[in-house]
């Protein structure tokens, strides 16, 4: 998710994967490690209670967890403008299912509108109600394009690829909710003495609007120690800031081009260019339309398309007198926009396909051709803002600023472009906004065009230092994976950790494994689902049990 230097993410993942391979890591079926074994293998020793209950949880609740995940995935909990979790039928059904599951598992449940609290009270003789272990998750999801799924994204698919649980929300973040609830149930079953209440917070607008959570936190006392399960292992101590640049390329058509002569020729003309599905997904699909395409130009396009790695193209044409109106469909690879290196951006690759050197003459000036020019000149195929003026920079731990055009859509005003960025520490929002404006001003001067609605937003990066649970979480991860001496990491993603005291992210995704949240093939493997249950059960015990 994050990078240190140009290849930070890939290097870290490669190292993690190498460690997994070197230790012949497999999903442990039964882990009860005596102290002598732990010492001999340099694996941290956890309490016997943590190990026993972790094993019990998997043996007892494997099938029930899959069934519960099936139920939660069935609700399309994406934000709908003008509706709230108390008026949207999908959210109402989702909360009803959470309440029913809480009752079945013997956990308390409280509905606060945008926030649901599910808890397991402390049970030690010295019961301090103000002492809590907070578990932070979210129940809303990003949109899913049904055309790109083998079946409905809201039906848990366990058959098309055995071993995978495929569906929207399986990794981000409904799978984590289910895992936390069954970890709490296993702890309750075994009557583990705890002096901390375990409180699971399920927020219902993490993907769209953090203001209701901020409002809730103004009158709610959160735990003094929190775990967010919405990112990756081993432990996340730094998150980049979610940021964006938006602008609109004005409507320009052949009829109002200054050079009227162009309108009377048969020059090939780029008339439409669009792509992307939502702002925090590297787009898998893009498309363009060109009028007056000659056979020679079509051949050039097809040849260039075949040379692009990771891309697939479909060309549809309607020809009259040897000139064709061409519709190009581009298909890349979706990815979470916090990890643009995991995707193949269909928007930028289609723009590269249509770059001006394709023709002997530049494209006539249209909204589409200007949008393509903006993509090629300000972004290119890179992901680190190398071409966007002076924006590019990096932090030694958090890695570089990343950039991905995510949505290009035609509106009444013109072609609206959304660029999603993830920024590390090292520059102020004011400087970044200034550098973005300067880069866009230079581009506008070059093309003699006035962009509309230029805006930028620069979210705050987070660095969490000295959280008391950090070493315990690292020890749990090391014990169950066999990875020796794991270290905290930074990610490009942005989670609700930023709003809670002493909040660290702990899973559910493994290092060295591509994160599938926000993609059009989101899944979690069954093995990972069960490994997460073991690690969460053990971690909850180690952090809440009476010492």
Regions found by a protein language model. Give the residues of each.
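Sec-exported extracytoplasmic/periplasmic mature domains
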Residues: 70-78, 103, 185-189, 355-362, ...
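Stable alpha-helical elements in mature extracytoplasmic
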Residues: 61-69, 90, 94-98, 176, ...
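An extended, acidic, His-containing surface patch that forms the Zn2+-binding/catalytic region
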Residues: 88, 338-418, 422-438, 444-547
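Gram-negative bacterial Sec-dependent N-terminal signal peptides
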Residues: 1-30
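Acidic-enriched catalytic cores of C-N bond-cleaving enzymes acting on peptides and small amides
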Residues: 238-240, 245-274, 279-333, 337-406, ...
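Acidic/histidine-rich catalytic neighborhood of metal-dependent amide-processing enzymes
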Residues: 173-260, 295, 383-397
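N-terminal helical capping/dimerization or prosegment-like subdomains
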Residues: 31-146, 416-419, 430, 524, ...
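Active-site metal-coordination/substrate-binding segment of hydrolases
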Residues: 128-202, 208, 219, 519-520, ...
């Amino acid at each position: 998710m994050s990078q240190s230097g140009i290849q930070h993410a890939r290097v870290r993942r490669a190292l993690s994967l190498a460690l997994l391979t070197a230790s012949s890591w497999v999903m442990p079926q039964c882990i009860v490690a005596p102290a002598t074994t732990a010492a001999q293998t340099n694996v941290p020793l956890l309490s016997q209670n943590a190990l026993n209950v972790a094993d019990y949880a998997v043996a007892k609740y494997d099938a029930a967890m899959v069934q519960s995940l099936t139920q939660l995935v069935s609700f399309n909990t994406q934000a709908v403008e003008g509706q709230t979790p108390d008026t949207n039928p999908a959210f109402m059904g989702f909360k009803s299912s959470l309440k029913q599951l809480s009752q079945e598992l013997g956990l308390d449940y409280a509905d606060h509108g945008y926030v649901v609290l599910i808890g397991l009270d402390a049970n030690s003789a010295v019961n301090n109600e103000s002492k809590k272990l907070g578990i932070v998750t979210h129940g809303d999801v990003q949109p899913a394009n049904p055309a790109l799924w083998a079946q409905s994204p809201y039906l848990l698919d366990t058959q098309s690829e055995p071993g995978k649980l495929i569906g929207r929300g399986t990794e981000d973040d409904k799978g984590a909710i289910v895992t936390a609830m069954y970890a709490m149930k296993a702890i309750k079953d075994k009557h583990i003495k705890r002096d901390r209440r375990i409180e699971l917070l399920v927020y219902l607008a993490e993907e769209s609007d953090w203001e209701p959570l901020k409002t809730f936190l103004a009158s709610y006392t959160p735990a003094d120690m929190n775990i967010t399960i919405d990112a990756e292992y081993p432990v996340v101590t730094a998150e980049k800031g979610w940021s964006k640049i938006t602008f609109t390329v004005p409507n320009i058509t052949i009829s109002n081009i200054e050079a009227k002569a162009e309108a009377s020729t048969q020059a090939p003309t780029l008339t439409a260019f669009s792509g992307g599905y939502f702002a925090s997904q590297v787009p898998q699909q893009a498309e363009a339309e060109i009028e007056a395409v000659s056979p020679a130009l079509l051949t050039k396009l097809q040849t260039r398309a075949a040379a692009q790695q990771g891309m697939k193209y479909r060309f549809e044409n309607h020809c009259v007198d040897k000139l064709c109106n061409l519709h190009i469909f581009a298909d890349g690879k979706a990815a979470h926009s916090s990890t643009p290196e995991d995707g193949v951006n269909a928007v930028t690759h289609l723009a590269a396909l249509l770059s001006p050197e394709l023709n002997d003459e530049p494209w006539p000036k249209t909204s589409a051709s200007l949008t393509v020019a903006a993509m090629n000149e300000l972004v290119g195929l890179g992901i680190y803002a190398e071409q966007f003026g002076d924006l590019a920079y990096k932090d030694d731990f958090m890695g570089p600023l990343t950039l991905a055009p995510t949505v290009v859509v035609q509106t009444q005003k013109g072609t609206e472009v959304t660029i999603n960025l993830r920024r590390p520490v090292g520059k102020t929002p004011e400087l970044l906004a200034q550098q973005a404006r300067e880069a866009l001003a230079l581009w506008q001067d070059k093309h003699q065009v006035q962009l509309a609605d230029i805006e930028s937003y620069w979210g705050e990066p987070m660095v969490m230092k000295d959280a008391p649970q950090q070493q315990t979480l690292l020890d749990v991860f090391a014990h169950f994976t066999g990875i020796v001496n794991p270290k905290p990491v930074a990610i490009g993603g942005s989670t609700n950790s930023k709003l809670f005291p002493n909040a660290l992210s702990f899973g559910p995704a493994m290092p060295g494994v591509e994160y599938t949240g926000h993609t059009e093939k989101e899944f979690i493997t069954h093995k990972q689902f069960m490994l997460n249950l073991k690690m969460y059960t053990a971690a909850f015990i180690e952090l809440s049990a009476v010492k």
